[in-house]
Amino acid sequence: MDASKVQELFRRAVASDDAVSMREGLEQMLGLGEHGGLSPEREYGLRRPDFVMDMPQSRERIRGRDALRKMQDAFPSPAPAVILRKVTGGRHVWVAEAEMDYGGDRWQTVVIFELDGHGLIARETRYYAREFEAPAWRAELVEAMD
């Protein structure tokens, strides 16, 4: 997988509000569907050198793509299985909703991507929520989601 192809999809998404290109770029970057995914080394090239990632729930910030690369290297294996549910947004800001499965420990995830005009990721803000059982009192008011 070539990072330049993913960057071109991101650049197209930014230039023309193209959600299909953004989704395809994310699928290729993450290795979803029939795509092989990018290694952390190639993914590195999709982020600006001054990239920032915020994780507000744990009050953590990673500054620089080099720091993110070190975090990726230290991540316990295996990486989670990802199901990309929805990609929405426009121009420089895109939101991805996904389900991440860490070996049976499932989390709902929202990632806000901020991209520059060249299709590079400048900033990510990541939110994680653990799944939980819905309360019985509202069962008649809602429908179950898959």
PLM regions: where:
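A solvent-exposed, acidic/Ser-Thr-rich amphipathic alpha-helical stretch
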Residues: 38-92, 133
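A generic structural motif
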Residues: 101, 113, 127-128
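Short acidic-aromatic low-complexity motifs
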Residues: 1-49
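Short beta-strand segments that buttress and anchor functional surface loops
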Residues: 95-103
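Short, surface-exposed coil-to-beta transition loops
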Residues: 79-82, 105-112
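Low-complexity, intrinsically disordered terminal/linker segments enriched in charged
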Residues: 1-12, 127-146
